Amino acid sequence: MAVYEEFMTHFDGYKIRNVMMFERMINECLHCGEQLLAYRDSQGRIRGYVRFRSRKDHVKVSECIYSGSTVLTKLLKAAVGNHTELRLEVSEAEHLEKVFPLAMSRKRIFTMVRCGNLPLFNKLYNANVRTSKDAYAIGFKPLYLNEKY
Protein backbone atom coordinates (compact mmCIF):
# COMPACT_ATOMS: atom_id res chain seq x y z
CA MET A 1 0.00 0.00 0.00
CA ALA A 2 2.89 2.37 0.71
CA VAL A 3 4.08 2.44 -2.92
CA TYR A 4 0.52 3.15 -4.10
CA GLU A 5 0.16 6.04 -1.65
CA GLU A 6 3.58 7.43 -2.63
CA PHE A 7 2.72 7.24 -6.35
CA MET A 8 -0.61 8.97 -5.82
CA THR A 9 0.95 11.98 -4.07
CA HIS A 10 1.88 13.16 -7.56
CA PHE A 11 -1.78 13.49 -8.60
CA ASP A 12 -4.69 15.69 -7.61
CA GLY A 13 -6.76 12.91 -6.11
CA TYR A 14 -7.10 9.18 -5.90
CA LYS A 15 -9.17 6.42 -4.46
CA ILE A 16 -8.16 5.40 -0.98
CA ARG A 17 -7.30 1.73 -0.92
CA ASN A 18 -6.97 -0.60 2.00
CA VAL A 19 -5.65 -4.15 2.35
CA MET A 20 -9.08 -5.62 1.59
CA MET A 21 -9.23 -3.75 -1.73
CA PHE A 22 -5.80 -5.05 -2.74
CA GLU A 23 -6.84 -8.59 -1.79
CA ARG A 24 -9.96 -8.17 -3.92
CA MET A 25 -7.83 -6.93 -6.83
CA ILE A 26 -5.51 -9.95 -6.53
CA ASN A 27 -8.51 -12.30 -6.46
CA GLU A 28 -9.99 -10.56 -9.50
CA CYS A 29 -6.71 -10.98 -11.39
CA LEU A 30 -6.72 -14.70 -10.66
CA HIS A 31 -10.27 -15.15 -11.92
CA CYS A 32 -10.10 -12.85 -14.95
CA GLY A 33 -6.92 -14.10 -16.59
CA GLU A 34 -4.82 -11.12 -15.59
CA GLN A 35 -1.38 -11.17 -14.03
CA LEU A 36 0.04 -9.05 -11.25
CA LEU A 37 3.80 -8.58 -10.89
CA ALA A 38 5.56 -6.73 -8.10
CA TYR A 39 9.08 -5.30 -8.04
CA ARG A 40 10.97 -5.43 -4.74
CA ASP A 41 14.09 -3.51 -3.78
CA SER A 42 17.16 -5.08 -2.14
CA GLN A 43 15.49 -4.78 1.29
CA GLY A 44 12.44 -6.70 0.06
CA ARG A 45 10.10 -3.69 -0.01
CA ILE A 46 7.63 -3.47 -2.87
CA ARG A 47 8.59 -0.48 -5.03
CA GLY A 48 5.99 -0.99 -7.75
CA TYR A 49 3.56 -3.35 -9.39
CA VAL A 50 1.96 -3.89 -12.77
CA ARG A 51 -1.41 -5.46 -13.55
CA PHE A 52 -1.73 -6.74 -17.11
CA ARG A 53 -3.32 -9.20 -19.51
CA SER A 54 -1.49 -11.01 -22.30
CA ARG A 55 -3.36 -10.94 -25.59
CA LYS A 56 -2.55 -12.76 -28.79
CA ASP A 57 -0.52 -9.93 -30.31
CA HIS A 58 0.16 -7.57 -27.40
CA VAL A 59 0.16 -7.01 -23.65
CA LYS A 60 -2.45 -4.64 -22.20
CA VAL A 61 -1.47 -2.98 -18.92
CA SER A 62 -4.48 -1.98 -16.85
CA GLU A 63 -2.54 -0.50 -13.94
CA CYS A 64 1.08 0.33 -13.25
CA ILE A 65 2.21 1.87 -9.97
CA TYR A 66 5.92 2.63 -9.62
CA SER A 67 8.36 4.59 -7.50
CA GLY A 68 10.73 5.68 -10.27
CA SER A 69 11.66 5.25 -13.91
CA THR A 70 13.96 2.28 -13.22
CA VAL A 71 11.15 0.41 -11.47
CA LEU A 72 8.75 1.30 -14.30
CA THR A 73 11.18 0.00 -16.92
CA LYS A 74 11.75 -3.28 -15.08
CA LEU A 75 8.02 -3.84 -14.52
CA LEU A 76 7.12 -3.22 -18.16
CA LYS A 77 10.00 -5.37 -19.39
CA ALA A 78 8.77 -8.25 -17.24
CA ALA A 79 5.17 -7.74 -18.36
CA VAL A 80 5.89 -7.60 -22.09
CA GLY A 81 7.74 -10.93 -22.01
CA ASN A 82 8.09 -12.24 -25.58
CA HIS A 83 5.44 -9.96 -27.05
CA THR A 84 6.46 -7.16 -29.40
CA GLU A 85 3.82 -4.66 -28.30
CA LEU A 86 2.78 -3.29 -24.93
CA ARG A 87 -0.20 -0.96 -24.45
CA LEU A 88 -0.22 1.36 -21.47
CA GLU A 89 -2.52 4.29 -20.72
CA VAL A 90 -1.04 7.08 -18.60
CA SER A 91 -1.74 10.72 -17.87
CA GLU A 92 0.15 13.25 -19.97
CA ALA A 93 1.77 14.52 -16.78
CA GLU A 94 3.79 11.33 -16.37
CA HIS A 95 5.94 12.34 -19.38
CA LEU A 96 6.89 8.78 -20.31
CA GLU A 97 8.42 10.07 -23.54
CA LYS A 98 11.48 10.93 -21.43
CA VAL A 99 11.88 7.29 -20.40
CA PHE A 100 10.70 5.76 -23.70
CA PRO A 101 11.55 8.30 -26.44
CA LEU A 102 10.77 5.86 -29.28
CA ALA A 103 7.37 4.80 -27.95
CA MET A 104 4.40 5.66 -30.13
CA SER A 105 1.81 7.64 -28.26
CA ARG A 106 -1.63 8.94 -28.98
CA LYS A 107 -3.92 11.15 -27.00
CA ARG A 108 -7.24 9.79 -25.94
CA ILE A 109 -9.70 11.91 -24.03
CA PHE A 110 -12.17 9.90 -22.03
CA THR A 111 -13.35 11.93 -19.05
CA MET A 112 -16.25 14.33 -19.11
CA VAL A 113 -17.15 16.46 -16.13
CA ARG A 114 -20.04 18.76 -15.49
CA CYS A 115 -20.16 21.07 -12.53
CA GLY A 116 -23.81 21.17 -11.48
CA ASN A 117 -23.66 24.13 -9.12
CA LEU A 118 -20.88 26.62 -9.82
CA PRO A 119 -21.82 29.05 -7.01
CA LEU A 120 -21.66 26.21 -4.48
CA PHE A 121 -18.35 24.94 -5.94
CA ASN A 122 -16.87 28.45 -5.76
CA LYS A 123 -18.02 28.84 -2.17
CA LEU A 124 -16.70 25.44 -1.06
CA TYR A 125 -13.31 25.85 -2.70
CA ASN A 126 -12.94 29.62 -2.37
CA ALA A 127 -12.66 29.86 -6.14
CA ASN A 128 -14.05 31.85 -9.02
CA VAL A 129 -14.55 29.28 -11.78
CA ARG A 130 -16.95 29.59 -14.71
CA THR A 131 -16.44 26.22 -16.40
CA SER A 132 -15.43 22.66 -15.53
CA LYS A 133 -12.12 23.30 -17.26
CA ASP A 134 -11.54 26.23 -14.90
CA ALA A 135 -12.31 23.94 -11.96
CA TYR A 136 -9.68 21.45 -13.12
CA ALA A 137 -7.16 24.26 -13.53
CA ILE A 138 -7.32 25.29 -9.86
CA GLY A 139 -5.60 22.02 -8.93
CA PHE A 140 -1.85 22.02 -9.33
CA LYS A 141 -1.42 18.27 -9.75
CA PRO A 142 -2.25 16.15 -12.77
CA LEU A 143 -5.54 14.33 -12.75
CA TYR A 144 -5.77 10.70 -11.76
CA LEU A 145 -9.05 9.30 -12.95
CA ASN A 146 -9.13 5.56 -12.41
CA GLU A 147 -12.78 4.64 -12.24
CA LYS A 148 -12.27 0.90 -11.84
CA TYR A 149 -11.51 0.87 -8.09
Q: Positions of the model-derived regions?
A:
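Active-site/acyl-donor-binding loops of N-acyltransferases
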Residues: 62-149
